[in-house]
């Protein structure tokens, strides 16, 4: 192995997307958006379909000049109500924020993180406000915490990943990022040269224009194998 390749194989910082990678935001949001739609008089609309449209609107806003996550969520709800021809109050987004304390970790998370302790520093990196991350039960403390609020920017344009590299005292040879989102994790990290493990829990096909990840896993259980053995 060349020196550069050897370094690339030995990450000292492993970062994780939170919502969708560590925490089941899809399941938790379905309940919250069901409440939002009922209160907006649109109980006939499929909550998951509506949530996916709302999430796509959020991601489009991540590319714009920084606004707090809560503001983006409210603006995207207003837009999605209009798209679905629903006369709803965008302040109903409070039901989504209230749900954060109920979001559950995926069953593979605790075991995998425990296996990584002592082998690399662990980070979380999330398009989120600090208070919402604090309300989320991650089950453990992380060595490095990076949020959109702290970085004053989001993942897709690279702002949050550049903040991660600086805050984590890492470079592209010593960082492995694990994330589920094609349009935030892969689009934001790969152009910076960051090694990415796509945690493809739902078995999706990579969308056109999305950079190819370095690794693709169905859950987090394979992440420790991406690090060198401790006796190497």
Show the residue positions of the predicted features.
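Asp-based, Mg2+/Mn2+-dependent phosphohydrolase catalytic module
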Residues: 1-14, 45, 110, 114, ...
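N-terminal helical cap/lid subdomain that shapes the substrate entry/recognition surface
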Residues: 7-107
């Amino acid at each position: 192995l060349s020196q550069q390749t050897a370094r690339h194989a030995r990450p000292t910082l492993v970062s994780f997307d939170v919502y969708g990678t560590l925490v089941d935001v899809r399941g938790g949001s379905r309940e919250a958006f069901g409440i939002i739609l009922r209160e907006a008089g649109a109980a006939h609309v499929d909550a998951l379909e509506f949530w996916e449209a709302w999430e796509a609107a959020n991601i489009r806003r991540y590319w714009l000049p920084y606004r707090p996550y809560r503001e983006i969520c409210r603006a995207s709800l207003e837009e999605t109500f209009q798209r679905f021809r629903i006369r709803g109050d965008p302040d109903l987004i409070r039901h989504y924020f209230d749900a954060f304390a109920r979001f559950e970790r995926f069953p593979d998370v605790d075991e995998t993180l425990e296996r990584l302790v002592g082998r690399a520093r662990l980070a979380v990196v999330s398009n989120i406000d600090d208070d919402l991350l604090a309300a989320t039960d991650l089950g453990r403390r992380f060595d490095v915490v990076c949020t959109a609020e702290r970085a004053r920017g989001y993942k897709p344009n690279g702002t949050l990943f550049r903040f991660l590299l600086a805050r984590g005292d890492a470079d592209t040879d010593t960082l492995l990022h694990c994330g589920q989102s094609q349009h935030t994790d892969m689009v934001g990290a790969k152009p910076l040269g960051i090694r990415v493990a796509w945690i493809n829990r739902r078995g999706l096909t990579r969308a056109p224009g999305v950079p190819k990840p370095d690794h693709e896993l169905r859950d987090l259980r394979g992440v420790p194998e991406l690090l060198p053995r401790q006796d190497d």
